[in-house]
Amino acid sequence: MISSYKYNPKLYFLSTFVVTYILWFTGAYLSFSSTYSGIYMLIMLPGLMAPFIISTILIAKSKNNELKKDFINRLFNLKLINLKTIPVVFLLMPAVILLSILLSIPFGGSISQFQFSGGFSFSTDFVPVLFLLLLAATFEELGWRGYAFDSLQSRYSLFKASILFGIFWSLWHFPLIFVNNSYQYEIFNQSIWYGLNFFLSILPMGIIITWMCLKNRKSIILAIIFHFLINLNQELLAITQDTKIIETGVLFLVAAAIILYDKKMFFEKLG
């Protein structure tokens, strides 16, 4: 974060939530309309871009050249990436998923979960799902890493900022449970517990992505790649929603291990 700039987390998150919620609740309504269901994604996509758009506006209007240069550098400078972390970037989520499947078997989970899913767990009428997963990772991390997280870290310790960010990131997805054919809509219709598990799983995920981003000198492109790989890995195997509950527990253990490993960094006092 830039010490010469005064971040405004309240303005950022309030603006992002208001814009996203208005667009996504509108899109949710249109997704069930026989007349407009084919174009509801035109409303949803700007909502997905809101974290990035608000971040860009605040940075552009800041009149702080150091802040602007820092954003551009973290977005395009590949030298920020620590090559030693690349194996973790690519292998962490597959390892978590495979371990979760193994742990599910004594509780009745099927070994067929090790098979490739052969498709995606949700559908859209407008944008290919794989492209949507990439868009989600890109626009979210451009906003979250471009301004949002730094704004929280300017006020709080890394640990508290990570917890707050995870809560905000989780709640940001809330309107999606009302969007026809969305992943969140599908799992909530299967079971409210599956839906709640989705929101809960975001909390440790926020800590993990934040830690990985910091270990790569806040590289935004690295955060985008890591986020996309997480999204993609969640769709590759035929993992059940029951196993995803176990997966959330594993993610919490991973997040806890990361915090203990870098305890000094997470609890370092400001100033």
Swiss-Prot record:
Subcellular location: Cell membrane
Top EC category: hydrolase
A GO CC annotation given for this chain: plasma membrane
Keyword DNA damage: no
Residue numbers marked as site, Transition state stabilizer: 227, 231
Keyword Lyase in annotation: no
UniProt-listed GO biological process terms: CAAX-box protein processing; proteolysis
Enzyme Commission numbers on file: 3.4.26.1
InterPro entries hit by this protein: MmRce1-like, Rce1/LyrA-like_dom
Extracellular side, ranges: 1-9, 60-82, 150-159, 214-219, 264-271
Effect annotated for changing residue 231 to D: Decreased enzymatic activity to 40 percent relative to wild-type. At higher pH 8.0 nearly loss of enzymatic activity whereas the activity of the wild-type is unchanged
MF-aspect GO terms: endopeptidase activity; peptidase activity
Cytoplasmic side of membrane: 31-38, 106-125, 180-192, 238-243
Main location (coarse class): membrane
Entry similarity comment: Belongs to the peptidase U48 family.
Protein name, per record: CAAX prenyl protease 2
Organism of origin: Methanococcus maripaludis (strain DSM 14266 / JCM 13030 / NBRC 101832 / S2 / LL)
Species lineage: Archaea, Methanobacteriati, Methanobacteriota, Methanomada group, Methanococci
